A protein has these predicted regions:
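Hydrophobic transmembrane alpha-helices and their helix-loop junctions in integral membrane proteins
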Residues: 1-118, 122-148, 152
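Cytoplasmic/organellar membrane-interface segments at the starts of transmembrane helices
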Residues: 81, 88-94, 147-228
Length: 228
């Protein structure tokens, strides 16, 4: 649990200290690993299931965030918060594509991050691990602050001229389409939260049941006899 808490806090502190979109997102990769370590460290069905669900949520969200980082750099010529601005007015589609995964990353309802983090927090409370729950909530608050930092720097402040010419319209359409598809994936996690939780619980039970895991890997039945 100490490793989980430190990973959350060190990652999010590093993100807050950065002034570049891609570097902020890179530090958040570290921070989010801490949540998965939290679930695994609880060593309960609910905790491990929460870690699995959190992983499912993270895959599309992180994909979107880095794709949006690429869209920002493509439009502005760089991703430094000191050299970009005004995208909400000029490229509102990028603003929307950023806002959805950013709120999800911070665990704001009704997005997938809220569902995933709530499952971990509930598992932590039920396991009596209040300290790691508090750390997780603090890390989520700082995550929201770092996402707000990107929003204010890139989208909200006065526009700045691009340092390099943007790519062609055809290339922009391709990049926007890929990002929209990934955003749809984050929304699908919310829509399918029930079935995904059931799947996560089943995976957690199998992982915590050593014999079941051995049987699945070796292809044996409960009697230890190899399956045909």
């Amino acid at each position: 649990m100490v490793a989980a808490g430190l990973t959350m806090l060190v990652g999010v502190a590093g993100a807050l200290a950065q002034n570049d979109v891609k570097r902020i997102l890179s530090f958040h990769v570290v921070s989010q690993i801490g949540y998965m370590l939290m679930g695994l460290g609880l060593f309960t069905v609910a905790g491990v299931a929460g870690a699995v669900l959190f992983l499912v949520h993270q895959i599309p969200v992180k994909t979107v965030m880095f794709l949006v980082g690429g869209l920002i750099e493509d439009d502005q010529g760089n991703s430094s918060l000191d050299k970009v601005g005004g995208l909400a007015a000029r490229r509102p589609i990028i603003a929307v594509l950023f806002a959805i995964p950013a709120l999800s990353l911070a665990g704001i309802p009704p997005f997938s991050g809220f569902v995933a983090k709530l499952s971990l927090i509930d598992a932590g409370i039920n396991a009596g691990s209040v300290a790691i729950v508090v750390v997780a909530l603090v890390a989520s608050m700082f995550t929201l602050l770092s996402m707000s930092k990107i929003w204010l720097g890139v989208f909200w402040r006065e526009p700045t001229p691009p340092s390099e010419p943007a790519s062609s319209k055809a290339s922009k359409r391709t990049m926007n389409g890929a990002t929209m598809a990934a955003v749809a994936g984050t929304l699908a996690v919310v829509a399918l939260a029930g079935p995904l939780w059931n799947m996560s619980e089943e995976i957690a039970r199998d992982l915590l049941d050593g014999q079941t895991y051995i049987d699945e890997v070796l292809g044996t039945d409960r009697g230890g006899v190899a399956s045909p």
